[in-house]
Amino acid sequence: MFQTLMNKDRSHIGKILFLGTFFLPVSSYAQYAWQEGAEAGKLDLGKDIHYEVEMQGSFSNDKTPLWLNANKYGLSSLEKNNGYLRGSVIRPLATDSAHRWGVGYGVDVAVPVNYTSHVVIQQAFMEARWLHGVLSIGSKQYPMELKNQTLSSGSQTLGINARPVPQVRLALPEYWTIPILHHWLHLKGHIAYGVMTDEKWQHDFTQRNSKYTDGLLYHSKAGFLKIGNEDVFFPLSLEMGLEMAVEFGGKPYRYVNGELVQIPTTGGLKGMWDAFIPGGEDATDGMYGNVAGNTLGSWMFRVNYDADTWALHFYGDHFFEDHSQLFFLDYDGYGEGDNWMGHTKRRYYRYKLKDIMLGTEVNIKYGTWLRNIVLEYLYTKYQSGPYNHDHTMNIPDHLAGMDGYYNHGIYPGWQHWGQVMGNPLYRSPIYNKNNQLYVYDNRFIAYHLGVDGSPSEHFDYRVLGTYQKGWGTYDAPFYKPHHNVSFLVEGAYKFKHNWKVRGAYAMDFGSEEMLGHNAGFQLTVSKSGLFKL
């Protein structure tokens, strides 16, 4: 939701973001890597095919509690009693790590009860690797960057809270070492285009009585730079980068003067280019030129200290919805009177860096009862301030505040199938009883703690606890601040022959404006293994 952006400013942003795409993440897992020097052998596409069958049931007194519902790639439900039977067949790229070429594929399907769908195709993808580059086509669950996958509250831009978006994705998924500077610099990144799949769900949820979008298109890109050298004894490293995403094109509908109206948009190659290098404008922008679509992203960093028996990490995730928090500057040198659209002064307004997610992670490498600890702090109240004013003939001052995180005037906001696509502490639209595709709590302060351990070879556990204080949104503020506390206690036991049973209990304690009072239990039974062809 980029605020007013003049052509001069837009060109600067475009150049910077275009250069940034050359420092483009997906996952830091070795499943993608080509192991140079390994013995190759013959490529066998029927080798190392993994299967998993899983059955899950959730039982609650009201809605499913937050941490039984969130960060499950959208495979969850708020209904008090729900469940699914799930089966997957996946051949990972790691199978071909000794080859210059690699091939991976997978299908992951769930048949749920009391979900938003009768059948969920959670994953269906094919991917090919040449050396270090990977081309993927289809729906796939991609992990978060620079955060613990099971203990963090979630990433603010490219999270794991919503269903995967079918896409074509070109990636350098693992850090590639630049063959100069003595192996101290490493790069990874991705570019992707896709299509949202929740069109019918939007129709059902809104009953077409409020805004929705058909055929909504998706674009994401990211790039990370790592400074460090694992070949020498130097335990300190720094990772930093940028994630960006855009919702664009499609057929947005909203009510204007009581009538349902389709808003014209730009799709095709022009729309894809405007999403790649933010440009164009929405039909509703008028004389104040914005960029087309719903554009958002995060500046991210992570400092790592890796010792022999322990590791310490400190990370940050700064979210933005427009240039006011992307660059913290806004041009504010417009003229007056007949020259009110002219750039007459070298004057800029500087925004503060207040909204941020900060986290610390401790890994005890040989720990049993205590293995990993994550502590996070989130602040999202500022959003460039409580004022938004486009310059006029009489008042030349320009302020681009009230950013409205995860919401958008035309599009349904940063959500997919009702779940926000970033951090689940932003209250997802699926909670709304008024059938609006709107995030009603995006201004909050939160503290989050996660710990896990493996007391024995067969048993492991996880505990999450979150405190949140919310102010609603700038457009729809709460009449007073509201609070919520959520926690989860989970244990899993591994039996012989790759059988696993996992039980979890969770509760929410909060006002109805937040999550309400919920308590629930979740039981999951799974069996995994390899097909022997």
Positions of PLM-derived features:
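Bacterial Sec-dependent N-terminal signal peptides
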Residues: M1-Q35, V525, G529-L533
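Transmembrane beta-strand segments of Gram-negative outer membrane beta-barrel proteins
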Residues: Y32-G83, D96-V107, G189-Y193
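Short loop/turn motifs that connect adjacent beta-strands in outer-membrane beta-barrel proteins
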Residues: W34-H50, R91-V103, T116, R129-G133, ...
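Transmembrane beta-barrel architecture of outer-membrane proteins
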Residues: H50-E54, K80-S88, V119-Q123, V165-R169, ...
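Transmembrane beta-strands of outer-membrane beta-barrel pores
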Residues: M55-K63, R91-L93, V107-V113, W130-H132, ...
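Surface-exposed loop and membrane-interface regions of Gram-negative outer-membrane beta-barrel proteins
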Residues: A98-A128, Y142-N161
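Internal, well-ordered domain-core segments that constitute the primary functional module
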Residues: P143-I263
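Exposed, low-structure sequence patches enriched in small/polar residues
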Residues: L236-L242, P252-L533
